[in-house]
């Protein structure tokens, strides 16, 4: 992809497949891929739970936005953290980007994927109702900035891959 073009930015709740699908598409197409959470952990030498524990969620959201800005012109595909839309700065920044893809998923499937995952501080030890409340609080924001939405529990990785491939090809024509 030409870096004068906008990257594909994957948004959505935790456990919807942003990192898995982003990496898959990047590997298949020989594109650059950045997972913002992994980027933060490598850059700051702390895990996401450690950052939450030592500095709090707001501090993490500021790091997340800073790292998104750093990566926006260097990656072809970016997987954001599920809560990136919680930051007003990041949300407003994303509103001005193209190719925002919302990966959505059924909350029961999300819960089964992330239940008690120690690497997800906003999900750890939460009931399905608590997780659903958090999910519902974010839906409108995901919807507001998404160019396209895929239900990752209804489509296979390869089906999403081919849909994204069509977007990449269309993007390269402009």
Curated annotation (Swiss-Prot):
Pfam families assigned: SKI
Keyword flag Hydrolase: no
Binding site for Mg(2+): 19
Keyword Transmembrane helix listed: no
CDD domains linked: SK
Biological role: Catalyzes the specific phosphorylation of the 3-hydroxyl group of shikimic acid using ATP as a cosubstrate.
Protein name: Shikimate kinase
Gene: aroK
């Amino acid at each position: 992809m030409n870096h004068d073009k906008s990257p594909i930015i994957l948004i959505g709740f935790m456990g919807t497949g942003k990192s898995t699908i982003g990496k898959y598409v990047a590997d298949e197409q020989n594109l650059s891929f950045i997972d913002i959470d992994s980027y933060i952990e490598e850059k700051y030498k702390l895990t996401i739970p450690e950052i939450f524990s030592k500095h709090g969620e707001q501090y993490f959201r500021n790091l997340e936005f800073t790292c998104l800005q750093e990566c926006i012109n260097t990656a072809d595909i970016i997987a954001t953290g599920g809560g990136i839309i919680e930051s007003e700065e990041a949300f407003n920044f994303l509103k001005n980007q193209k190719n925002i893809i919302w990966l959505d998923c059924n909350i029961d499937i999300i819960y089964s994927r992330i239940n008690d995952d120690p690497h997800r501080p906003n999900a750890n030890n939460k009931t399905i109702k608590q997780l659903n409340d958090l999910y519902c609080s974010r839906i409108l924001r995901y919807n507001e900035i998404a160019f396209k939405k895929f239900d990752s529990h209804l489509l296979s990785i390869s089906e999403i891959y081919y849909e994204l491939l069509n977007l990449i090809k269309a993007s390269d024509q402009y």
